Amino acid sequence: MSSIPISTEGYDRLMKELERLKSERPAIIQAIKEAREEGDLKENAGYDAARERQGMLEARISYIESRMAQFNVINLDSLSGDKVMFGATVEIEDLDSGEAKRYTLLGPDEADYAQGTISVLSPVARALLGKEEGDEIVVDAPRGRISYEIISVAFEGARR
């Protein structure tokens, strides 16, 4: 079993989600019970909906609990250096278009492209890991090979 990096903030967020999901269990069980009391389960939309919700809830709980044992929790406030690694915020420039992008490299359970966070397992992050400001990388993307220059590497700590 390999370890999965996650920030302290990301771990805390998942723990809160797990607590919330577990607190929803009694209400779903009650909804199933009430729907079952309505009679014929074959044509009972309320029962079907409650069972489906229960299935999704239990699947998410199971997923989070199984990941917990694999997490390597990393305090972003303790990170520093010149090389790109987990927790780094990196600004890169597309050498063809001149377009600049800024990403923070976090664990797969924290990646949110819209928020500027990418998984350390993504192709871009894998190409960046271990590199420094001024280095060039090449990423194989659906539209072809893209060359980037690393403009800056920073460690900004936890995002509050």
Curated annotation (Swiss-Prot):
InterPro entries: GreA/GreB_C_sf (IPR036953), TF_GreA/GreB_CS (IPR018151), Tscrpt_elong_fac_GreA (IPR006359), Tscrpt_elong_fac_GreA/B (IPR028624), Tscrpt_elong_fac_GreA/B_C (IPR001437), Tscrpt_elong_fac_GreA/B_fam (IPR023459), Tscrpt_elong_fac_GreA/B_N (IPR022691), Tscrpt_elong_fac_GreA/B_N_sf (IPR036805). The keyword DNA-binding applies. It holds the Pfam family GreA_GreB_N. The keyword Transcription applies. Residues 11-38 form a coiled coil. Keywords: Coiled coil, DNA-binding, Transcription, Transcription regulation. One of its GO terms (molecular function) is RNA polymerase binding. GO terms for biological process: DNA-templated transcription elongation; regulation of DNA-templated transcription elongation. PROSITE patterns: GREAB_1, GREAB_2. Belongs to the GreA/GreB family. Necessary for efficient RNA polymerase transcription elongation past template-encoded arresting sites. The arresting sites in DNA have the property of trapping a certain fraction of elongating RNA polymerases that pass through, resulting in locked ternary complexes. Cleavage of the nascent transcript by cleavage factors such as GreA or GreB allows the resumption of elongation from the new 3'terminus. GreA releases sequences of 2 to 3 nucleotides. HAMAP family: GreA_GreB. This is Transcription elongation factor GreA.
